[in-house]
């Protein structure tokens, strides 16, 4: 369901939000000292290039397909922070001709879950560019993505004077227990994960930032049935024409200035939107959940989510008789989970 637009912030609230934005920008600026350049190819960035910014840890399984996927869509350069990976992530990325790589051993949680580092890269290199801010387990689809690349999409958004594209994060899962089998590096994750929950999803517009809050779907159904308000936030603004004066507040779920949050109103909205296919539940999910639980670097209160990690370790079956097999963007548009907005 789509969210109604909340009333904008009053004068005092607007002033406080400006101060908050400046504090976030200052945090991002300071965080540059935590990043060590490993491979800098940013000199090749040309006007009009589409950039992708991400923070990763131990993503050697997903990265080969991820990089090829976004290259095909038209991404010119990837700006990546490697947060102390222990697998082949760093050498894999350093060998790519279109990747600029930084490394850090600093705390992911203390850096606002990597957002300070990503925000610095956006500030330094993204100004004036259409930029994607993504995790390695997110594949963006949008109307006509099988025939029109990101250049075509962003050109159309520019003509509409729309600075961002919103998206629903849609969890994909297997029909059997999670964590079973194996996935080869470079394999299409949709060969393993091809089911999803078509709903229900609910959307709420929050004051004073006018940010959207979408929840629902399979993780709420399976892991948070008694505490639905603790379930994951599913709305994002993953594609945006960046301005160095802007600041993401909570991942790319919300942003300042507040009016940018109105670019997306959730499932059922009429404005152009996409879907982030979330490939979290590949066979490595149980091992990753155990590591995340031990490292305590996710969630503001990691201890309160111990039950969530324990449930993943039990390798549950997420599939239900209401699950749908994923068929493509037209299917999701027909279900109201994305909109072409007249494109």
Name these PLM-found stretches.
Residues 88-133, 141-147:
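Active-site-proximal specificity loops/subdomain of glycosyltransferases
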Residues 68-76:
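Short, acidic, metal-binding catalytic loop of nucleotide-sugar glycosyltransferases
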Residues 76-84:
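Short beta-strand/loop segment that forms part of the nucleotide-sugar
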Residues 2-68:
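N-proximal low-complexity "stem/linker" segments adjacent to membrane-targeting elements
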Residues 74-75, 127, 135, 161:
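Short loop/turn motifs at secondary-structure junctions
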Residues 2-29, 114, 144-343:
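Catalytic-site signature of metal-activated, phosphate-bearing donor transferases
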Residues 57, 83-86, 96-98, 104-107, ...:
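An acidic- and aromatic-residue-enriched active-site/binding cleft used to recognize and process polar
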